[in-house]
Amino acid sequence: MPTIQQLIRHGRSVKVSKTASPALEKCPQKRGVCTRVYTTTPKKPNSALRKVARVRLSNKIEVTAYIPGEGHNLQEHSIVLIRGGRVKDLPGVRYHIVRGTLDTSGVSDRKQSRSKYGAKQPKAVAAKK
């Protein structure tokens, strides 16, 4: 516990919080161009081929972003929108690609959680209403 005199001399130091997604630079999303689209394997207890893309953002920073959902149409030079959000079992992947925006198509035949995957409402449901 500092004395009053010590506080007068030095003051309190402000704790600096570290951001989880520094490449976004305090923006909610950023646009970028895919430089490489590939699959990678997750950490120890899990086993899969996770789809990821290396993206050069509009601020010239290059990041690795996860492609959510089943199937995608991304290739090199595709323009994508990325948001923050890490993938727990992929080290170094701290961003997600937003489905259904720019060059990224939405997930086809998606019935639930459609807004998260850029899927339109199915025609059969729309006709009933």
Swiss-Prot record:
GO terms for cellular component: small ribosomal subunit. CDD domains: Ribosomal_S12. It comes from Chlorobium luteolum (strain DSM 273 / BCRC 81028 / 2530) (Pelodictyon luteolum). It holds the Pfam family Ribosom_S12_S23. Keywords: Methylation, Ribonucleoprotein, Ribosomal protein, RNA-binding, rRNA-binding, tRNA-binding. One of its GO terms (biological process) is translation. The keyword Aminoacyl-tRNA synthetase does not apply. The lineage of its organism: Bacteria, Pseudomonadati, Chlorobiota, Chlorobiia, Chlorobiales. InterPro entries: NA-bd_OB-fold, Ribosomal_uS12, Ribosomal_uS12_bac. Part of the 30S ribosomal subunit. Contacts proteins S8 and S17. May interact with IF1 in the 30S initiation complex. Residues 101-129 are annotated as: Disordered. With S4 and S5 plays an important role in translational accuracy. Interacts with and stabilizes bases of the 16S rRNA that are involved in tRNA selection in the A site and with the mRNA backbone. Located at the interface of the 30S and 50S subunits, it traverses the body of the 30S subunit contacting proteins on the other side and probably holding the rRNA structure together. The combined cluster of proteins S8, S12 and S17 appears to hold together the shoulder and platform of the 30S subunit. Belongs to the universal ribosomal protein uS12 family. The gene is rpsL. The modification 3-methylthioaspartic acid is found at D89. GO terms for molecular function: rRNA binding; structural constituent of ribosome; tRNA binding. This is Small ribosomal subunit protein uS12.
